Amino acid sequence: KEEALEKEPLLPETILNGAGYYAEYRTDDARLTIEVLKTALDYDAKMINYTEATEFIYEENRVIGANVKDSISGDEFAIKAKYVVNACGPWVDELRQINNSKIGKRLHLTKGVHLVVAHEKLPVKQSVYFDVPDGRMMFAIPRGKVTYFGTTDTNYQKDKNTVETNLVDATYLISAVNNMFPDINISLDDVQSSWAGLRPLIYEEGKSASELSRKDEIFVSETELISIAGGKLTGYRKMAERIVDLVAKKYNRRFDKEFEDIKTKEIVLSGGAFKNSSEVKSYTDAIQNRIAEVDFTRIDAEYLVHNYGKQTDIILQKFDDIMHDNMQEKMIKAEVWFAINYEMATNPTDFFMRRTGRLFFNSESVHQFKNFVLSEFKTAFSWDIKTTENHQKELKHYIKMATTFE
């Protein structure tokens, strides 16, 4: 008990018997996805962003590609392939439906919600994993100036493109945290932002959302569309390995070509060439010293390193080259440049939500710099007034989704 309180003084002493201490994963799912894609580019992969598959192309009753539509320009074109893998998460069944192969097992979507408050409102020293009155488990995780906590696990059957946190979700999470930390007393007004995601689980008869297995499964249709669903983010490399091995075997049988074994566990993601945590700290120290001269803090250094890894050097080089009096805007300008030129960002929502996480973890900066960032994108892509207004409305919509509950 004493050791637990030393590591986390916020734990309720009167009911505390003890605690376990273990290593756990923490990541930013959008940043992880981007870095995986960028690393794949180094191995001759081709990337297409904002493109929707509308129908499959068949030859001799085999899927050999897809007709797709550019969501920005409206252009339509075909992509050919020896094999097609459907790894679309919550949308896996939609593509199976297009392929007329949505039979047997199907997805069961559940929603997970997270709330974000100022760190001083929930000042945990480190991540805490705890149970709540209904028997579920929750976590609270410090990140920079904020702490986020969650998550819920409820059935979901609405629009997959607009997954919102509602008042019931927010009230449940706040009540659970206040129950665990009675002296905190968080209210709805303390919530700075929120986000919600979907778990693409495999349906099992008679099981509740929390009871459904998180195991991934592979489905191969009669036309050889290969689909994968279920699983957890922490196992994404193992899931990818299973799919790639399956495709390689099929390819070898059909086209008589063998592939060398690829040891993906030895591949370091772009920007992440750190040997250990002490090396991360040393690099962060160096970045802090570099930006302290222009009034940035330790939290700013940690934000850059946690988001971009050693790619921070690229951003700071651009920062040094930019002629701009306001240092905060100058740094944002360098980040926007990096997002556009290195990460295929096409609009302010991409930047604030999917490339930097500012919408969730630093919502104040979104309000502060939204017009400046909009102007940067307008200049970069030569937008007309209507296009600029549309992207302004889109960002406003996502800000409302993250900061209000109905």
Q: What positions do the PLM features span?
A:
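Short, hydrophobic/aromatic-rich segments at coil-to-beta transitions
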Residues: 62-66, 124-126
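Glycine-rich beta-alpha-beta "Rossmann" dinucleotide-binding loop(s) and their flanking helix/strand
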Residues: 40, 95-113
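Aromatic/hydrophobic pocket-lining residues that form π-stacking "cages" and hydrophobic walls in ligand
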Residues: 36
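Well-ordered beta-strand positions in beta-sheet-rich domains
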Residues: 76-80, 114, 266
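Core beta-strand elements of the Rossmann-like FAD/NAD(P) dinucleotide-binding domain
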Residues: 72-83, 87
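Short beta-strand segments that buttress and anchor functional surface loops
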Residues: 21-22, 66-70
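C-terminal accessory subdomains/tails of enzymes that are appended
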Residues: 3-14, 21-24, 28-30, 42-43, ...
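A conserved short coil-to-beta-strand element within the FAD-binding core of flavoproteins
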Residues: 49-64
